[in-house]
Each structure stands twice: as structure tokens, then as C-alpha cells.
Regions:
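His/Asp/Glu-enriched, well-ordered alpha-helical/loop segment
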Residues: 268-275, 317-403, 419
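C-terminal cap of metal-dependent C-N hydrolases
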Residues: 4, 391-450
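Metal-coordinating catalytic core of metallo-dependent amide/deamination hydrolases
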Residues: 151-281, 285
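Histidine/acidic-residue-rich catalytic or RNA/ligand-binding cores of hydrolases
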Residues: 155, 248-260, 288-293, 310-319, ...
Length: 477
């Protein structure tokens, strides 16, 4: 899969050859090619699937019974949510924010000293490392993390988690100055700008990590704050990321309160352009869609969270028809319950095909592009395809699992979308390093990470038994 060879091209017996953190060759494998690689590189090789790791002959280059893909690219998510899976279910977005997100992030902040002593590290780092495990488990090697709520104060921890995991990450740093938890309001709004300046100075040179503005919602950020954040984005040449029109009641409340939709509001302050990435964009008017199209803004669809929280689904077919670019992502583990990005792609298509009674909409090839090459282009990352010069980000999916048998060249992409359950990701390579090999994590201490998150989740449950109930977060405050 590459722009050069064709994003829908399938190769029966292919290979990818990497050096350091880049792909230097990709294409059809032949015995002659294998002999050349052995001759040129000798023991300076790591051959995935080989039984030995030195003194290679061409016979050691095995044909893995896997499907080789680009590493998946997640264009919207939250890395603090693993410990709140299953909390505050069967409720709408704003109730879930009250009952899960803000309770948990407030717990981490309020009990920070106690939790740090317990774990010997920042409790935020504990949960962010679990999010790295979640992504790698499902083959996600690059992401844009919307670092909202109390998390906006803990960027150093997420940068460290990304460094340890050897993944790529854009950190969209949150802000709020109205209609939100009083403890985290950025009043005066220069606090949000000062925070970005500080993070940019501290982390500008950190490899595989980028800082951008990530105001939480249009309803929670006033016009002067959004204008200042947009100026910062332009001055620094970055993207800017925001939730938009996600939940129907809040979207309707916003229009009643401010006399315009969130998109009309954004347009009125010149917030929207080709550098603007909108998460969700579920609830729209025809005028909203026309504004988005004209502005060049892009949309990230998160079907797992949108369905679980009852937010609705965006008009993807209309967006396609008028030329609004969109990709598919998972959102956070707390609202989506997992980071199975193949499931997200399947869920998006299932709904749209059924709703429009059009089985031809969102084919398997298109869906795969919307979790690889297209989000990589959205995020300006040098990944998402298998071709010379791209970052060495790859996923090997195990084709020996019963749900993926039979797989052939003509049905492999269809099987990945419709038959996989996410657990078939066998090996993951990111930036030239093997992160997961034959289902085993190679860089992260998997057992320690999952044990700490299990303990943290139990401590949160105890805390919630006596914690003050939070109400009115988001809208209607």
C-alpha cells in the first residue's frame, strides 16, 4: 500500500527492507532479492520470523503467514482513559464526562502525592503507559492525543510515555475558559498560551513528539481564547485540534444560547482552515457542512464512542459527495472501550451501509486507507504507507487465526475489515524498532503496566464511593 504503487495494490509475496528508522525498499520478493540482501548486509540484519539471528542464508528469509500493513494511524484519542473503561455507561456525553472523565482526572490531581508514593512514579504516567500498550496491541504506531481536562498539566508524563513506547505522537494540549469544571478554567486566557509556550520550549527537540493547541470544545472555549490559540498555531506552523458538535443536546443548547451552531461560531472568528482538525462533527446543518467544505477543515470520525454515548453518526456520505475529507479513529478507551481501530473502521461502514441502504459505500480498501495513509496525511506524518523514504512503521497480522481463514490475495483486505477481531496483530514495528514480536511486547514492561492500572482502577473505585458528585460539566452549567 503506497501512493507510488497504488494505495489499493496487493502483493502476494512482498517484503519491506528498513534501515534505522526508514523504509529503504518495498515490493515483490524474489529469491534473487533475498540473496542480494544477505550478500550486502550479512549479519547486520534482523529477519522477522527467522529462527536464528546470525549467519543467515537465503533459506532463513521465511515467508511469514501474515499480512504486512503500514502501522495504523489514530487521528483522535485520549491517553488517560484506560482506567475508566466501564464507568458511567449508558449515558450521554456530558453525563459521562461528569461521571467518569472529570472524576478520574480530578482524582489523579487531588491524590497525586499519595499515588506517586504508591507507584513510585506519576499516576498520570501509569495510565499513559497503559494507553501505549493499548495502541501497540492493536497495531497503532502513530496518534494525535487530545490532552484535555487535568491532563493539560501533565504533558511531561505523556511525552515520557511516548518516548518509552517508541511511537509517534502529536499532543493536542487542552484549554477551557467557560462551561466546565471550575478547577481547570484558563482565566485569564493567557494561561493557555503560556502553557503552550512552556511545552513548546521544553519538548520541541524531543523525537517523535509534537505539541499543538487542542482546545477542548467550542462550547468550553470563548472567542478570545480560541483566537489566541489560532494565532499560536499559525505562528508556529502547527495544526489545531478540537471536539466539535459531538453530542446532540449540547449542540442544540449551544445554538439556543449563542444564536449559532458551533461551526458557525468557529467560522465567525476565523478558526476554520485546512490546518483545523475537527473531532466527531456528528450533528450538522446544511450550512455547517458548506462552511466546513469551504474552509478546508478536516473531520475525524469516531464511531465506537459516538454509538456507545448515543451521540449519533456524522453524515459521511454527504461529506464524501461534497468533498469534506474525513478519516476514522477510535477516540479514547473510556468512551470506546478499546483501541481496535479495525473495529472502528468496520463499525463506521456497517452503520453507513445500513442507514443509506448502499452496500457500495465505504469499501474495505477505502476503510483501510482511512486508518493508514489518509490520517497520516491529515497529521503531516511521514508514515501510513509502505514505500521508500517513509518511516519504518509496520504491522503484521496473523493469517493463521481461524477467523481469517481462508485468506487470499483477492479477499485479504475484506477479511481484515470484516473478519478480524483486533487480536491478530502479531508483530508491530515503529520507527524501525520492534515493539511487539510474536505477540510479546519488547520495549514496554507489559506485566508491570497492566498490574499498575488494575490497582489504580481499584483505588479510583474506592475514591468514587465517597467523592463529591460532579454535575453540569460541559454545557448547562
Amino acid at each position: 500500500m503506497s501512493r507510488r504503487m497504488g494505495v489499493s495494490k496487493r502483493i502476494l509475496d512482498g517484503y519491506v527492507f528498513t534501515e534505522n528508522d526508514k523504509i529503504i525498499e518495498a515490493g515483490n520478493y524474489t529469491r534473487e532479492k533475498g540473496e542480494q540482501i544477505i550478500r550486502d548486509y550479512g549479519n547486520n540484519l534482523f529477519i522477522v520470523g527467522a529462527e536464528k539471528q546470525s549467519d543467515y542464508t537465503v533459506e532463513d528469509i521465511v515467508c511469514n503467514e501474515t499480512c504486512l500493513l503500514p502501522g495504523f494511524v489514530k487521528a483522535h484519542g485520549h491517553d488517560h482513559e484506560s482506567p475508566i473503561i466501564g464507568i458511567a455507561k449508558d449515558c450521554a456525553l456530558t453525563d459521562w464526562l461528569d461521571g467518569a472523565v472529570n472524576v478520574f482526572t480530578g482524582f489523579l490531581d487531588e491524590k497525586r502525592d499519595e499515588l506517586t508514593n504508591k507507584f513510585g512514579k506519576s499516576p498520570n504516567l501509569v495510565t499513559y503507559l497503559k494507553a501505549r500498550v493499548d495502541d501497540i496491541y492493536y497495531g497503532i504506531t502513530s496518534s494525535m492525543v487530545h490532552h484535555c481536562n487535568f491532563n493539560k498539566y501533565r504533558v511531561a508524563d505523556i511525552v515520557e510515555a511516548n518516548r518509552q513506547a517508541h511511537t509517534k505522537m502529536i499532543v493536542a494540549v487542552g484549554s477551557q475558559d467557560r462551561h466546565y469544571d471550575d478547577r481547570i478554567l484558563d482565566i485569564p486566557h493567557h494561561l493557555a498560551i503560556d502553557r503552550l509556550d512552556d511545552y513548546q520550549e521544553k519538548f520541541e527537540g524531543v523525537e517523535r513528539t509534537w505539541i499543538i493547541p487542542g482546545p477542548d470544545q467550542f462550547f468550553s472555549n470563548g472567542p478570545e481564547l480560541l483566537k489566541a490559540l489560532k494565532r499560536w498555531s499559525k505562528d508556529h506552523g502547527t495544526l489545531i485540534h478540537i471536539h466539535s458538535s459531538e453530542e446532540p443536546r449540547t449542540t442544540a443548547w449551544f445554538k439556543e444560547t449563542y444564536g449559532m451552531t458551533p461551526i458557525e461560531y468557529a467560522n465567525s472568528i476565523e478558526f476554520l482552515d485546512s490546518d483545523t482538525i475537527l473531532a466527531h462533527q456528528v450533528n450538522n446543518t446544511e450550512k455547517d457542512l458548506a462552511i466546513i467544505k469551504e474552509s478546508g477543515a478536516k473531520v475525524v470520525h469516531n464511531p465506537l464512542a459516538n454509538t456507545i454515548l448515543g451521540s449519533g453518526m456524522p453524515p459521511l456520505k454527504k461529506m464524501t459527495e461534497i468533498g469534506i475529507p474525513f478519516v476514522i479513529s477510535t477516540d479514547g478507551s473510556g468512551s470506546a472501550d478499546n483501541q481496535d481501530i479495525l473495529l472502528a473502521a468496520k463499525s463506521a461502514a456497517q452503520y453507513q451501509k445500513a442507514f443509506h441502504q448502499d452496500a457500495s459505500f465505504l469499501t474495505s480498501d477505502v476503510l483501510l486507507q482511512k486508518i493508514t495513509v489518509e490520517p497520516a496525511e491529515f497529521l503531516r506524518l511521514n508514515t501510513g504507507s509502505l514505500e521508500k523514504g517513509k518511516d519504518a512503521d509496520m504491522v503484521l497480522v496473523d493469517l493463521t487465526r481461524p477467523n481469517l481463514i481462508p485468506s487470499r490475495l483477492d479477499n485479504i483486505v475484506e477479511n481484515l475489515i470484516w473478519a478480524s477481531d483486533g487480536s491478530e496483530v502479531k508483530t508491530v514495528v515503529a520507527n524501525g524498532k520492534v515493539l511487539k514480536l510474536d505477540y510479546r511486547f519488547t520495549l514496554l514492561d507489559y506485566e508491570t503496566i497492566i498490574g499498575e492500572v488494575q490497582l489504580l482502577s481499584g483505588m479510583l473505585a474506592d475514591y468514587m464511593m465517597t467523592a463529591k458528585k460532579i454535575t453540569g460539566t460541559g454545557a448547562h452549567k
